[in-house]
Amino acid sequence: MWRDMLEQVSELGNVLPRFTAPRCLLERQAVGGSDACHTTCPHEAVILGQLGSSVDIDPDRCTGCGLCVQVCPSGALEYDLEPALQSVHDQRASGGASLACAPSGAGGPTVPCLGRVTPALVSAAGAWDVPLTLIHGDCPNCPVGAPDVPARVEQLGRAHV
């Protein structure tokens, strides 16, 4: 029990996504490997190694927005979805669920940035038949994510309807 609590606390304090090299298409040198994590990062925190054969996250640049995780086709980059999934699941009885980005100040269940909303989270809400409302703040001036976070999340939602 204590170990689980300590892991949850350490997860909250760590803005860096977990990286699992064996899943990474670049690390595996798979044909058509993906550099989507690198090209989507608004803070230039995802660094590709020589010849694009490795991926590193610069802890000084990473804000934890989650956009790299959202676009990773192999799941090599990830955050723990359990708190967000549990929140959506717990809100089912009210007929809908909401998640807000923390900088919005909207209150209620939050994530650091809506960039952390992944296809798995959208799919889970759909599978539970829970309408999911996402609340963002002033994205163009936010130091965590990027100005186009709402458009990216909307596109993600359309792809999983």
For each feature predicted by the language model, list its residue ranges.
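Ferredoxin-type iron-sulfur electron-transfer modules and their immediate structural context
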Residues: 1-40, 44, 94-103
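Iron-sulfur cluster-binding cysteine motifs and their immediate structural context
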Residues: 32-57, 67-84
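PEST-like low-complexity intrinsically disordered regions enriched in Ser/Thr/Pro and acidic residues
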Residues: 112-114, 138-145
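Well-ordered, non-membrane alpha-helical segments in soluble/globular domains
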Residues: 118, 147-156
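Conserved small/polar residues in nucleotide/adenosyl-binding loops
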Residues: 159-161
